[in-house]
């Protein structure tokens, strides 16, 4: 065995990918980075604000401070604070002497509305987790495994052809094998490509992904509506007139009907309202961008794997409308690019292929690795002429 042949064998052996069977499921990312960011913000931010509201309530005591008359006892003053917080309504008297009541309940419901918002924003996450993730994880495991196996099969094919070249005394045998490998499919059943074609006709994952983002937009719109309808109406009101002629003070003739109370938690209410509107306004373009990514193919990823035999979705123009499950899977393949060991190898080979002087004879990884192993990528002219003379 020659030194060059040994070096080529070592080089091809090093190019083979290790078997990572069983360890990939834990490392798979089943949420896109932007989706994960949106999840943490839409769910975590309301919970953070809810904690702020509860902390302010516990630290400052009563969220309102009523200006009770000086002749009130401690018991009566405590009753006024409790009664006004329970009713939390602003009373004004019109010219006819009738009371107009304006409810200030958004102040009281603030922590619970934030909790409801966090729960609502978590529903799209649960939808994706239980409806799409089981199917997506199996798809990714199979496709990643098959892509790496296809790369390994290509390298083993080059090893086999190198052995044929070294063991055969007739160079025509090697070139016949090489031409046959170029013209025919390397697999009797191109399972991966047919599986990807099947996913191109499926719309389960993409429908779930669209529904997830549509629900996020719907709940965000509901948040805007809630803030505009209820919070804006009481946003600047720091005082209110409370009707106290009830319960303990109902029969007290010397007690006024209305007293003034001040909302001590108004600043927290305003901070929560403004920050919620600002954060969700920022997130809307992110959600829309996530949806627009479904309108285009990741041809950069596909073009790299065009170097594999029997993987020609691009060259055969098999890509149609991008709104299907295959496009969603490609987005997650890009997010799990660290799990695709073959991608880094093929990326390097693709760059090197573009710099070689014999591009017309190098189409797949088999052609390039054959060339790197020290073999001619095409039949030498003297052998071609010899074959032509024999047929003549």
Swiss-Prot record:
GO BP annotations, alphabetical order: cell-cell signaling; osteoblast differentiation; positive regulation of interleukin-1 production
Keyword Nucleus found: no
Principal subcellular localisation of the protein: membrane
Membrane-related topology note: Multi-pass membrane protein
Entry-listed glycosylation sites: 71
Classification via Pfam families: Innexin
Tissue expression from the record: Expressed in skin, cartilage, heart, lung, liver, spleen, thymus and kidney. Not expressed in brain. Expressed in calvarial cells.
Spans within the Extracellular topological domain: 61-113, 237-267
Molecular function per GO: calcium channel activity; gap junction hemi-channel activity; structural molecule activity
Cytoplasmic side: 1-39, 135-215, 289-392
Compartment(s) where it occurs, according to its Swiss-Prot or TrEMBL record: Cell membrane; Endoplasmic reticulum membrane
Reaction(s) the record says it catalyses: Ca(2+)(in) = Ca(2+)(out); ATP(in) = ATP(out)
A Gene Ontology cellular-component term: endoplasmic reticulum membrane
PTM description: N-glycosylation may play a role in cell surface targeting.
Residues spanning the membrane: 40-60, 114-134, 216-236, 268-288
Keywords: Cell membrane, Endoplasmic reticulum, Glycoprotein, Ion channel, Ion transport, Membrane, Transmembrane, Transmembrane helix, Transport
InterPro entries in UniProt: Innexin (IPR000990), Pannexin (IPR039099)
Family: Belongs to the pannexin family.
UniProt subunit comment: Homoheptameric.
Function: Regulator of osteoblast differentiation by functionning as a Ca(2+) channel in the endoplasmic reticulum which regulates calmodulin (CaM) pathways. Allows ATP release into the extracellular space and activation or purinergic receptors.
Protein's name in the database: Pannexin-3
Source organism (scientific name): Mus musculus
């Amino acid at each position: 065995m020659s030194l060059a042949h040994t070096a080529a064998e070592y080089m091809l052996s090093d190019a083979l990918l290790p078997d990572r069977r069983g360890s990939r499921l834990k490392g798979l990312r089943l949420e896109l980075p932007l989706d994960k960011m949106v999840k943490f913000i839409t769910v975590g931010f309301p919970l953070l604000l809810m904690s702020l509201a509860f902390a302010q309530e516990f630290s400052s005591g009563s969220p309102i401070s009523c200006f009770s008359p000086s002749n009130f006892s401690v018991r009566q003053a405590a009753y006024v604070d409790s009664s006004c917080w329970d009713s939390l309504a602003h009373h004004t008297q019109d010219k006819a002497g009738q009371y107009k009541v304006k409810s200030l309940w958004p102040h009281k419901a603030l922590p619970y509305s934030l909790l409801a918002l966090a729960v609502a924003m978590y529903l799209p996450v649960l939808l994706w987790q239980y409806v799409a993730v089981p199917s997506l994880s199996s798809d990714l495991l199979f496709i990643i495994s098959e892509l790496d196996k296809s790369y390994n099969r290509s390298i083993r094919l080059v090893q086999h052809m190198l052995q044929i070249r070294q063991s055969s005394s007739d160079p025509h045998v090697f070139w016949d094998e090489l031409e046959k490998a170029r013209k025919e499919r390397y697999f009797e059943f191109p399972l991966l490509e047919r599986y990807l074609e099947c996913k191109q006709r499926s719309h389960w994952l993409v429908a779930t992904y669209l529904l997830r983002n549509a629900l996020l937009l719907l709940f965000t719109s509901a948040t805007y509506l809630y803030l505009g309808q209820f919070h804006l109406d009481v946003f600047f009101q720091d005082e209110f007139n409370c009707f106290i002629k009830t319960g303990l003070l109902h029969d007290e003739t010397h007690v006024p009907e209305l007293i003034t109370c001040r909302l001590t938690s108004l600043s927290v209410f305003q901070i929560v309202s403004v920050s919620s509107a600002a954060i969700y306004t920022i997130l809307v373009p992110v959600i829309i961008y996530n949806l627009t990514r479904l309108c285009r193919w990741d041809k950069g990823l596909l073009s790299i794997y065009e170097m594999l035999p029997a993987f020609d979705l691009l060259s055969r123009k098999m890509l149609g409308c991008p709104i299907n499950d295959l496009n969603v899977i490609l987005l997650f393949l890009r997010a799990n690019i660290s799990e695709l060991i073959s991608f880094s190898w093929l990326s390097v080979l693709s760059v090197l292929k573009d710099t070689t002087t014999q591009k017309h004879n190098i189409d797949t990884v088999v052609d390039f690795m054959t060339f790197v192993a020290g073999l001619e990528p095409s039949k030498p002219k003297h052998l071609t002429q010899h074959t032509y003379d024999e047929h003549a």
